[in-house]
C-alpha cells in the first residue's frame, strides 16, 4: 500500500481519490491502501463509495477496519439480471461523479462494481487505477462474468497494480505500456 501511495504522488495525483467497491474481498484488499492514504490528509481526500453489492458483508468488513463509506449506493435488488445490476450501478455512479470533484478512481479485482467504476470514471475522463490487475484465464466464460470484467477494466485503466510478474506479462501481452504496470504484490 505504501508503494501505491508513492506511485500516486509520483504521478502528480493529489486530493480527491474515490475508492469504489461493493464486496467483502474488495474491501479486504483496498483497506490497507485506504488507511495508508488517510494518513496524509494534506495530500489526499479519500472518498469511500460502497455500491453494496454484498451489503451486510461489505458494511461489516468496513467496520472491522474502522472505516465507513462516505457514499452508500444500495444498488442491489432481488433477482436482478447482470444487465440490471450494471445499469443501476452505472447510473448511481454517474450521479456521484457529476456531484463531486474526483481526480482519480481506484478499483480492485473483477466484479461488476469494478467494471462500472472503471467505465464511469472513463466516461468522465478521470484516470482509473486498477489494483489486482492482469489476472487472466483467457476464457471469457470462466470465471463468468469476471474474466470479461477484468479484461474490460484493463482497457480503460491508466495504472495497473499487478500482484505478480505473471500478471504484468499478461498485461504486456495485451499491449499495455510497461510504464503503466507496477508489480506491487497483494495488499
What would you call each of these model-derived segments?
Residues 96-103:
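Glycine-rich phosphate-binding loop signature in dinucleotide/nucleotide-binding domains
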Amino acid at each position: 500500500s505504501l508503494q501505491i501511495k508513492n506511485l500516486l504522488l509520483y504521478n502528480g495525483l493529489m486530493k480527491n481519490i474515490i475508492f469504489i467497491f461493493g464486496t467483502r474481498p474488495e474491501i479486504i484488499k483496498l483497506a490497507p491502501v485506504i488507511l495508508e492514504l488517510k494518513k496524509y490528509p494534506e495530500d489526499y481526500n479519500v472518498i469511500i463509495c460502497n455500491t453494496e453489492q454484498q451489503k451486510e458483508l461489505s458494511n461489516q468488513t468496513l467496520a472491522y477496519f474502522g472505516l465507513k463509506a462516505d457514499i452508500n449506493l444500495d444498488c442491489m435488488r432481488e433477482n436482478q439480471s447482470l444487465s440490471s445490476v450494471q445499469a443501476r450501478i452505472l447510473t448511481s455512479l454517474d450521479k456521484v461523479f457529476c456531484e463531486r470533484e474526483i481526480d482519480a478512481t481506484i478499483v480492485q479485482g473483477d466484479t461488476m462494481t469494478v467494471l462500472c467504476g472503471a467505465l464511469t470514471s472513463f466516461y468522465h475522463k478521470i484516470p482509473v487505477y486498477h489494483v489486482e490487475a492482469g489476472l487472466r484465464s483467457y476464457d471469457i466464460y470462466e470465471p463468468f462474468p469476471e474474466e470479461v470484467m477484468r479484461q474490460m477494466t484493463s482497457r480503460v485503466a491508466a495504472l495497473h497494480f499487478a500482484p505478480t510478474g505473471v500478471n504484468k506479462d499478461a498485461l504486456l501481452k495485451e499491449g499495455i505500456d510497461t510504464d503503466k504496470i507496477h508489480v506491487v504484490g497483494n495488499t
